[in-house]
Curated annotation (Swiss-Prot):
The keyword Ribonucleoprotein applies. GO terms for biological process: translation. GO terms for cellular component: ribonucleoprotein complex; ribosome. It comes from Cereibacter sphaeroides (strain ATCC 17025 / ATH 2.4.3). Keywords: Ribonucleoprotein, Ribosomal protein, RNA-binding, rRNA-binding. PROSITE patterns: RIBOSOMAL_L9. This is Large ribosomal subunit protein bL9. Belongs to the bacterial ribosomal protein bL9 family. PANTHER family: 50S RIBOSOMAL PROTEIN L9. InterPro entries: Ribosomal_bL9, Ribosomal_bL9/RNase_H1_N, Ribosomal_bL9_bac/chp, Ribosomal_bL9_C, Ribosomal_bL9_C_sf, Ribosomal_bL9_N, Ribosomal_bL9_N_sf.
Length: 189
């Protein structure tokens, strides 16, 4: 099916282009979302008449997105989740969790704007892309931790695995000292 794009669509084209797409993609996504019109003579004429208005509207939304992007770019958000001692999450952090974390901090982010390269299934710092406008994208950091204190430690640069290794080494040292004391006490007798 041929459609006229009413806005820039990633991996498809710019506003005003007539492109061929699969019928299902057009019927189920592009047309209902208002991102495209069927390419017939009457729609092409109406698009040409509205083109200046659509371009002005697109430019305005791009400016608004750029203003939000300036504030949002590089921000870090804490997401608290339960996890195993090894740092594996029980479940995963989703686009909804990232959007909720940004919304709690005062930003207007929809879950459809959040792009995860891969599922987040472990504790730590994860970089996530937020597409505010088809031409404006920013990177944010999700600090996934078991508690706010752990999130602060991760933000300072220590990983959960390093902290667990330090705690285990300290416990081993205490056990070794205890056995040394027991051995010294038995030799005294």
């Amino acid at each position: 099916m041929q459609v006229i794009l009413l806005q820039r669509v990633a991996k498809l084209g710019q506003m005003g282009e007539v492109v061929n797409v699969k019928d299902g993609y057009a019927r189920n996504y592009l047309l209902p979302q208002g991102k495209a019109l069927r390419a017939n003579e009457s729609n092409i004429k109406s698009f040409e008449a509205r083109k200046a208005q659509l371009e002005a509207q697109n430019l305005e939304t791009k400016k608004e997105a750029a203003a939000v992007a300036e504030k949002l770019d590089g921000q870090s958000f804490v997401v608290i989740r339960s996890a195993s001692d090894a740092g594996a999450l029980y479940g995963s952090v989703t686009t909804r969790d990232a959007a909720d974390a940004a919304t709690e901090a005062g930003f207007t982010v929809d879950r459809g704007q959040v792009v995860l390269d891969r599922p987040i299934k472990e504790l730590g710092l994860h970089t996530v892309t937020v597409t505010l406008h088809p031409e404006v994208a920013v990177k944010i950091t999700l600090n996934v931790a078991r508690s706010p204190e752990e999130a602060e430690l991760q933000a300072s640069g220590k990983s959960i695995q390093e902290l667990a290794a330090e705690a285990e080494a300290a416990a081993d040292f205490e056990i070794a000292e205890l056995f040394d004391e027991i051995g010294a006490a038995s030799q005294d007798e």
